[in-house]
C-alpha cells in the first residue's frame, strides 16, 4: 500500500490503472478525479460528524438551548451535503459514469434515510439491492461502461 499525505496518495492513485483508493474523511472534499479515474465509489457509512468532538458538543448544546434538535438542524444536513459531495466526485461531467454504493443500512432503516436519498440529483438512479445482486450489477456496469444499465 501507499501511505503519505492526501496529495501524494491522490497522485499515485490517479497515475495507476485499476487502482483502489481507501480514503477517510479528508477525501470527501476538494478532490477532482475526472473521467475514468473514478468509476466505483463505495461509501461504508453516512458521513456524520463524531458527536464526541468538542466543537460538535458545544454546537449541539447551543442548538438544544435554542430549543432545536441538533440532529435534524445540524448533523443530518451536514452529512447529507457530504454524501452529495462524495457522489459528486464520481459524476463531475456529462461524460463521467460510475456506480456509487452506500453500505450504510440507515438509508433504508431510519426515517431520515428517505429524506437523504431525495436530496440526491433527481436523474440519479437509486436502487436497493442485496450484496450478491449488487456485485453482479456493478460488474456489468463497469464492463459496459457508460452504456451499462442498473436495474
Model-based region annotation:
Residues 1-151:
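ASCE RecA-like P-loop NTPase motor cores
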Amino acid at each position: 500500500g501507499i501511505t503519505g499525505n492526501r496529495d501524494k496518495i491522490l497522485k499515485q492513485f490517479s497515475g495507476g490503472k485499476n487502482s483502489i483508493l481507501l480514503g477517510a474523511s479528508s477525501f470527501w472534499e476538494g478532490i477532482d478525479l475526472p473521467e475514468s479515474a473514478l468509476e466505483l465509489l463505495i461509501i461504508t457509512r453516512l458521513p456524520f460528524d463524531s458527536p464526541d468532538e468538542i466543537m460538535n458538543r458545544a454546537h449541539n448544546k447551543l442548538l438544544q438551548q435554542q430549543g432545536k434538535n441538533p440532529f435534524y438542524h445540524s448533523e443530518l444536513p451536514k452529512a447529507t451535503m457530504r454524501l452529495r459531495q462524495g457522489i459528486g466526485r464520481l459524476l463531475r461531467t456529462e461524460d463521467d459514469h460510475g456506480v456509487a454504493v452506500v453500505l450504510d443500512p440507515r438509508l433504508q432503516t431510519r426515517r431520515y434515510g428517505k429524506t437523504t436519498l431525495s436530496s440526491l440529483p433527481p436523474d440519479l438512479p437509486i436502487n436497493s439491492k442485496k450484496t450478491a445482486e449488487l456485485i453482479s450489477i456493478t460488474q456489468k456496469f463497469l464492463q459496459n461502461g457508460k452504456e451499462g444499465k442498473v436495474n
